[in-house]
From Swiss-Prot:
Quaternary structure note: Component of the replication restart primosome.
Protein name: Replication restart protein PriA
GO CC field: primosome complex
SUPFAM superfamilies: P-loop containing nucleoside triphosphate hydrolases
PANTHER family documented for this protein: PRIMOSOMAL PROTEIN N (PTHR30580:SF0)
Signal recorded as keyword: no
UniProt-listed Gene3D superfamilies: P-loop containing nucleotide triphosphate hydrolases (3.40.50.300), PriA, 3(prime) DNA-binding domain (3.40.1440.60)
Binding site for ATP: 241-248
Binding-site residues for Zn(2+) 1, renumbered to this chain: 458, 461, 499, 502
Amino acid sequence: MDPTHQSFRLYAEVLVSANINKILDYGIPAELEDRVTIGSVVKVPLQRKVTNDKYKFAIVLKIKDSSDFANVIQPIAGISYEGVTLPKDLIDLIFWISQYYFCPLGSTLSLFLPTVYSQTHSTKHQNNVFLGQNAERTQEIIKSIEDPHQIAVLRKLLKTTKPLTPKELIKKTDISTKILDSLSKQGFIRIVDSANLEIQDEQLQYFLPEPPTLTQEQIEAINTISQSLITTKFQTCLLFGVTGSGKTEVYLQVIRKARSLGKSVILLVPEVALTIQTLSFFKMHFGAEVGVLHYKLSESERTQTWHKAARGLINIIIGPRSAIFCPMQNLGLIIVDEEHDGAYKQSDLPPFYQARDVAVMRGKFTNATVILGSATPSLESYTNALSKKYTLSVLSKRASTSIPTKVSLIDMNREMEKTRKKILFSPTVIRSIEQRLAVGEQTIIFFNRRGFHTNVSCSSCKYTLKCPHCDMILTFHKTERILLCHLCNTRLSKPITSCPQCHGTMTLQYRGAGTEKIEALLQDFFPTVRTIRLDSDTTRYRGSHDALIKQFATGKADILIGTQMIAKGMHFPAVTLSVVLSGDSGLYIPDFRAAEQVFQLITQVTGRSGRSYLPGEVLIQTFLPQNSTISHALAQDFPAFYKEEILGRKACNYPPFTRLIRCIFLGKCAEYTLQEAQRMHELIKQNLDAQASLMDISPCGHFKVKDLFHYQFLIKTRNILTVNKQLQDAFSAAKLSSKVRCIVDIDPITTFF
């Protein structure tokens, strides 16, 4: 029968996972009437004739017995997730996110469905080779076999501190794939899809601590949060605890309390990288009740966990920001660990939500207790706690097993005067690393630039090589022998023979340093040192981050070198030295959050040292030893930093005293993009609420990215929803050219890049 003439007894109002901002009516076929309920996930057509792979996912919002479009209505094609319905708190959250973050309802819905979300987030797969037996047994195997190629492979794996792909191992040992196949069949090696490292329990073994004796501050925090759980009233608690103060132990105890009350739990961590270490700890205590959810899982893994949580078979979900959208039965507790972290802000695809704030709103919709934990709270959260909007629990001392860490500042101006040249490592740092190597203790070195050389120029005219598609200087990556753009990933692997500026024969000069060079220098200083480098180059494949962390945690390397990802919640009991090579680099960025982010980063890095019975030391190298942000970070004095920073925020009317809306215009023609931005700016100026203020248009910090030019302006307001409505009216009136795209970012974490 032609669906345009089909009649139905019942109709459903549904929200479709497409880039549309309205609710549509569909007919409910007779065979689905008993199975479709409010919150059901269904499949619907958006066009008259569709194939099975063209159906869209949708959520049923309302069931009714009539429709204004009954004559042309199409039927629901089927139920996608049988027996699973989205709870009311999630449906309310969809509408709130859409309104607040200025995003169509259909695009917002994609966050909440596992299949749709996984289709928009892809990742790379890679196999890694591991020993099939422990080191002692492998040594015995080497003595028992005669094939020199097999022996070479096993010896290489015994020595390596980094996961190797089959291709890398074949190249390093000069063997064929048959050798690897033979060793694998005998059980002497394992060839594992790196993705599986994230879900195999046997891979989740780290140093397991003895149950600690709780401090009085921990007991008070646990009691405060437990009382909130018992009353079943929405409450947000800021758990402000210095690094090593035992916030995780507080999480453990309140999760136990929530489970004893029959309530489920969501625990957010900033990045997938932290999920495995956190999962290991909580699986040890709660076993099969715990599930992990993030975009790097396969579609089937993600969907399976989502279904189990929706049915109450998993009651504790751990994951990065996307885990906040998991349907849970009787959700009673939401924990946002490292709540200050910028990774909670989605920046790649709309809606550009802040998961910390979404967590608070979900807690409100479901009457749950929300914990925001950090050693360096965001200024917004700390202000909310001081104003009593949130309750405040403070852990001011390190846990009883921790010895206070010694923190020292190294003035690199003086070091350069002594050496009369630029140096990356001061003598003090070299001596301190040497002392750790001598006694078998570990060191973490933080340097927030990747690659080998960060500046490559013509030796004749000094022209610096830039990306042809962006206004970004190219970085030399020695491992791959390429020049790489860190904005658009353009790779130049062929030698450059003539200078684009002077057209002379190109002789390159290399300057600047990244983590690759830091690793190379350390190996020059200490030829026998075992290093692991942790940055986006070494962790691009699924599971590679976890494999590297496991190697370091089990003592297979002496020094961990990395970018900001090493600052986030890692727990390594054998680390007694943390080094910040360039403590002031982030302060040169013209962004209102720059000082806050530098303070947070230095404080978090220093917290990686001395987390067990061994005394820790932190060394911070800087060219700005008198800078107050660095001084406060050196003293680990967040209240003093807050007191100073909040004065500047208030004087300039920046968050937390207002909220920001950032409108970014992108187009291939710089002049035309600016014209459209000016036209939109004028329309908004005419209609803007008197309580809001409109800032001038300016080029973005990265003006050209992927051949698109970027302009922006900011709106300051206390009422986002009101201004969003005025923005929508302005967009409707402006009818922007299809050649220019506008991105609206609510509560941006940066106003520069």
